[in-house]
Design a protein with these regions (language model features):
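Surface-exposed loop and turn segments in beta-propeller and other repeat-based domains
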Residues: 46-54, 95-106, 146-153, 189-212, ...
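Structural signature of eukaryotic scaffold interfaces centered on beta-propeller domains
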Residues: 62-65, 111-116, 158-164, 208-222, ...
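Beta-strand-rich domains and repeat architectures in extracellular enzymes and scaffolds
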Residues: 51-81, 284-295
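A short helix->beta-strand "capping" segment at the edge of beta-propeller domains
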Residues: 34-58, 320
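Asp-box/WD-like beta-propeller blade repeats and closely related beta-sheet repeat scaffolds
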Residues: 128, 136-167, 171
């Protein structure tokens, strides 16, 4: 599927691109049209400061979250453990957990995680179709699995989630709805919305549409904002769950472009966003904007295209563009601290992959 292929697998992308170099995206059809943003009122270039670690652990550091003087980094392709906890801001290794393997206590994959507190770290294993909750102790240098929530088979292969006080929010990957509310037993209890495409597409290609619209999501319980950014194209959705409003925005690159072949979606536009963080006032997102035909050209020249995004886009909670940061390093995951004006980011292109930016 598109999303599994795109995240962290340049070899898979290359094979797909070479195989689809002659196909084009879906044809525009009359339908709903959403607002566009084209520029940001403020732009600024910022430079990375490399964080020096006392241990070499990472193969593909994809996500990072800092909370309660602890930083947790998720490594998408680690041979041993998917998660690594450090003290913060000193970055001393505490413990690695989420052992990779096929055993009952092990994980087949790690798509993302949510760090709520030291005893509430939720991790999503799409291949096992389960969410596990972990607790870590800096004092004991330990991590223990507290519970496992097995997801209903009707959710197919969930690739992202947000945990709220009452349920999980999980995107729908069949294309019938936009996302599900899922109870803490793993059962879907309510479907919400539809994919906000501007194209008039046949119902039989909805699974391909859902693949193309694979989104990264975040939820802020303080303001009730759930936001999604697409991995392909340049589309943003903002659900205000307290006011029951839904905002859709397209950037200059528009919605995800794809070609449907036998019900499967093949990307033909750009790599879009790679992470999203919602604070009390703003929405931060990492943006790539690299065209697939440029990636294909790089592979055909025998070169490896850059992996990651060099932009952080900032929107207010209503979707108005506020700030565009241009980075001197390509990044994937971000953690935002507005009080200290600090961005912690992961970079898969560097041997020193944890970086800090000041905004």
């Amino acid at each position: 599927e598109i999303s599994a292929c795109l995240v962290g697998s340049e070899m898979c992308i290359r094979d797909r691109l070479i195989g689809i170099s002659a196909i084009i995206s879906c044809t525009d059809s009359p339908g709903t049209y959403y607002p566009r943003y084209s520029t940001f009122p403020n732009e600024k270039a910022i430079s990375a400061r490399v964080i020096e670690l006392d241990t070499a652990l990472f193969r593909y550091p994809f996500r990072v979250v800092v909370k309660d003087s602890i930083a947790i980094v998720m490594d998408l392709h680690n041979a041993d453990n998917y998660f690594h906890a450090f003290t913060y801001p000193n970055w001393k290794h505490i413990v690695s957990f989420g052992k990779r393997g096929e055993g009952p206590e092990e994980m087949l994959s790690a798509e993302t995680f949510q760090f709520n507190s030291l005893d509430s770290i939720y991790a999503l294993d799409a291949n096992k179709m389960q969410i596990s909750r972990w607790a870590i102790s800096a004092k004991d240098h330990s991590a223990t699995r507290q519970e496992v929530i097995r997801l209903d088979k009707n959710l197919i292969r969930s690739l992202d989630f947000c945990a709220t006080d009452s349920c999980f929010l999980i995107p729908d990957y069949l294309g019938e709805h936009r996302y599900w509310q899922v109870n803490y037993s793993g059962k879907p209890i309510r479907s919400i919305g539809k994919i906000p495409t501007e194209k008039d597409l046949a119902s039989e290609i909805r699974p391909a549409l859902a693949q193309a619209w694979r989104s990264f999501i975040d939820y802020n319980p303080h303001n009730g904002i759930l936001a999604m950014v697409t991995q392909l194209g340049e589309s943003i959705e903002i659900y205000n769950t307290k006011e029951n409003t839904h905002t859709v925005l397209y950037g200059p690159n528009g919605e995800p472009r794809f070609k449907s072949i036998k019900g499967e979606g093949f990307p033909t536009g750009i790599m879009g966003f790679s992470d999203i963080v919602i604070t009390d006032k703003y929405i931060y997102s990492v943006f790539q904007g690299i065209r697939f035909k440029d990636k294909l050209a790089s592979y055909q020249r025998g070169e490896k295209p850059e992996d990651g995004g060099r932009y952080i886009y900032v929107f207010d909670l209503k979707g108005n563009p506020i700030q565009k940061y241009t980075l001197d390093k390509p990044i994937y995951g971000i953690d935002i601290n507005e009080k200290t004006k600090t961005v912690i980011a992961t970079c898969v292109e560097s041997d020193e992959p944890i970086m800090e930016f000041k905004i």
